[in-house]
Amino acid sequence: MEHTLPPLPFDKNALAPHMSEETLEYHYGKHHQTYVTNLNKLIPGTEFENLSLEEIVKKSSGGVFNNSAQVWNHTFFWNSLSPKGGGAPTGALADAINAKYGSFDKFKEEFAKVATGTFGSGWTWLVKKTDGTVDIVSTSNAATPLTTDAKALLTIDVWEHAYYIDYRNARPKFIEAYWNIANWDFAAKNFGA
């Protein structure tokens, strides 16, 4: 089965000024596409050849895992963003965040602290644990909650290619801008699923 680059859920210029069209040209059009291309080169003739992307992520290791997980992580990241994003979550997700962190502002502070403190390349995730509570998880490189019992709700990509064009080496500024485009509707849908 050949894997393809999923379409973005928004136009490449729709996230400006928080994320530029140029960033999306490179991040989506080059980096994400390269993971798809590499995966398609790695799986022919293997046990992964006819598996879904999620099955490959859960069952693979090495280069196959790195590329398949990065395809999945990036697709999840694009869905974690919206030109109509920002604001704060509502309903059950807001209740879960407030129960864990005391307030949405305290959650944002903790999320930003974890994302800023992620050493090297990786991801910061808001996840739902099996007991129904939420947590903030940092993963390195291509690691993903998909291989755990936690359910991903929302993520931010903290690899340098995610922000270097717009923010240079200022990861905290990128994280601050992220709150303007965070897709809380997507996170709430994941929380309820």
UniProtKB/Swiss-Prot annotation:
Q: What does the record's cofactor remark say about binding?
A: Binds 1 Fe cation per subunit.
Which UniProt keyword terms apply here? Iron, Metal-binding, Oxidoreductase
Q: How does activity depend on pH?
A: Optimum pH is 7.5.
Q: Which reaction does it catalyse?
A: 2 superoxide + 2 H(+) = H2O2 + O2
Which N-terminal residues, if any, form the signal peptide?
Answer: none
Which positions does UniProt annotate for Fe cation binding? 27, 74, 157, 161
Q: Which cofactor does it need?
A: Fe cation
| InterPro entries named among the record's database cross-references | Mn/Fe_SOD, Mn/Fe_SOD_BS, Mn/Fe_SOD_C, Mn/Fe_SOD_N, Mn/Fe_SOD_N_sf, SOD_C_sf
GO molecular function: any one?
superoxide dismutase activity
What EC number(s) has UniProt assigned to this enzyme?
A: 1.15.1.1
Q: How is the subunit organization of this protein annotated in UniProt?
A: Monomer.
The family annotation for this protein states: Belongs to the iron/manganese superoxide dismutase family.
Q: What does this protein do?
A: Destroys superoxide anion radicals which are normally produced within the cells and which are toxic to biological systems. Involved in the metabolism of 4-aminophenol. May have an indirect role in hydroxyquinol metabolism by scavenging and detoxifying reactive species that promote its auto-oxidation.
Record's protein name = Superoxide dismutase [Fe]
Please report the organism this UniProt entry assigns to the protein: Burkholderia sp
Q: What is the organism lineage in this UniProt record? A: Bacteria, Pseudomonadati, Pseudomonadota, Betaproteobacteria, Burkholderiales
